[in-house]
Amino acid sequence: MSRSVETAGVLLITVPAIEFGGLSLLKFMAARTPGYMDNPMRQGLFRAGHAHAGVLVLLALVALLYLDEAALSDGVKDVVRLFIVAPPILMPAGFFFSVTSPAADRPNKLIWLVYAGAVALAVAAVTLGVGLLRAG
């Protein structure tokens, strides 16, 4: 089994955690939870975290399908593999953990995780894209 297939298996195991996050948001809305319903900053960042988790896991799964076909060295493939699976963890974590306080009116310093995930995603996407073009 290739490392990309193993990584995809691990990513698929994270899907229930994303579902749990969505269920939590639904409960916050249904119960009109104070600290969520009365805090637009928290609502926005929690929603962004949940959305990014789902979309980035799907993007990572698709990218992993192509990684083994790219004209890249094994070491570079390992870096791409790491950098393509880091954003679905880093970015949602940054969105959620930057507004842990129900009274937060702006993100705390943990918002840097969002930027770190974005950089990792850009590096992985461009590197994989170039590797695929070179292989073609």
Write out the residue ranges for each language-model feature.
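Polytopic transmembrane helical bundles with strong interfacial aromatic enrichment
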Residues: 1-136
